[in-house]
Regions:
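Long, low-complexity intrinsically disordered regions enriched in acidic and polar residues
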Residues: 1-356
Length: 356
């Protein structure tokens, strides 16, 4: 995607810079970008066009580029479908077939990106983790993966943007979950809340000696019918791809695991996401889920509430949401499992789940 203007246009395609912006601002950023299309085999990771894109991604500061199209780009939904682009992803402006694409001849590469790009023995997974630990923005890591710049030579390939986002979130969150295994559990039942773009979040962290995670999503359709999506993992990890919640699952899991890693703690986590379609009128991508959960868990925002029982914590988590606690409970597999386990233990050890 290229902006039709000169200067530093980083904010137009950099979710990390969008906190505090309105949905109108973000849609405006996206619609100002023109998307050029060229069709390539996924195994084609060389050639003038691909290498130009790779240079742009590795640049340590914004660089100039020029795109010439076969004909005037148009914002046509049917055209987007024909070109295989995902119309459910963040919006973007006009799209058209590229004729020529050129970049500035004075691009200086970010050394962190350059190292993993030229390391042809480094596995893609390890490259992703290395870049994350060195402070590279997630959106940049996702683009590096998408352009076939990570992994051993024989395994490098182009990756659709949506897949690269999910793969990056999954890889980093799995690494972080593994890293917190030996940490002490949180002391109390903790609840965090945050809302933006018509997305309302409640996160419950539960004292436990093992990691478990569940994400629930609830929404009302145009007819007023309630919809639910739920995916979860226990201490053994995911048994299959979380097809109900999909990429949002990994985005939320990354934010939670990241927070626990910084605190040097571990917990079982429940994430409730309620979507108000009258406010969330245009989907802006799973980045808003990751950033929404991050903001909820941000220590500086002082949003944490502590409780001594799972029931009171869960009740508080549901209290600011339109969907009733009964519905959230009915659709939650992990919460009901935890309740059954705690009731059984409480029968033999009264007061075990209350601080003295």
């Amino acid at each position: 995607m290229v902006p039709p203007i000169h200067g530093d246009t980083t904010i137009l395609d950099k979710p990390e810079k969008w906190h505090g912006k309105s949905i109108e601002d973000i849609v405006g950023y996206r619609l100002s970008l023109v998307r050029g299309v060229m069709t390539y085999d996924i195994h084609t990771i060389t050639g003038k066009y691909i290498e130009s894109l790779q240079e742009l991604v590795m640049a340590d500061k914004p660089a100039e580029s020029e795109a010439v199209f076969e004909k005037k780009p148009v914002p046509d939904v049917d055209q987007l479908k024909r070109k295989g682009l995902d119309i459910e992803s963040p919006p973007f402006g006009p799209v058209g077939d590229l004729k020529i694409f050129r970049t500035s001849c004075s691009i200086k590469a970010d050394r962190r990106l350059e190292r993993v790009y030229y390391d042809r023995d480094l596995k893609a997974k390890n490259g992703i983790i290395s870049l994350y630990e060195k402070g590279v923005d997630l959106s940049t890591i996702q683009r590096v993966l998408s352009l076939g710049m990570l992994g051993s030579t024989k395994n490098r390939r182009l990756v659709p943007s949506r897949w690269s986002v999910t793969a990056t979130d999954d890889t980093i969150s799995s690494y972080l979950v593994k890293s917190i295994e030996t940490n002490n559990a949180v002391d109390y039942y903790e609840v965090y809340k945050y809302s933006h773009f018509g997305n309302y979040y409640s996160i419950v962290l539960i004292p436990d000696h093992v990691w478990s995670f569940e994400m629930q999503e609830a929404w009302f359709d145009k007819q007023g019918n309630l919809g639910f999506a739920v995916d979860f993992e226990d201490a053994n990890g995911l048994k299959q791809y979380p097809s109900s919640v999909a990429g949002a699952y990994f985005a939320a899991r990354l934010a939670v695991a990241e927070y626990l890693s910084k605190r040097k703690r571990k917990a079982t986590a429940l994430v409730l996401r309620e979507i108000h379609s009258e406010e969330y009128v245009v989907p802006v991508g799973v980045w808003q889920i990751r950033e929404g959960v991050r903001q909820a868990l941000d220590d500086k925002s002082n949003l944490k509430k502590e409780f001594e029982s799972l029931e009171t914590a869960y009740k508080y988590a549901c209290s600011s949401l339109s969907v009733s606690e009964i519905e959230w409970t009915r659709n939650s597999k992990l919460y009901r499992n935890l309740r059954r386990t705690q009731l059984s233990i409480h029968h033999f050890f009264p007061g075990m789940f209350h601080k003295q």
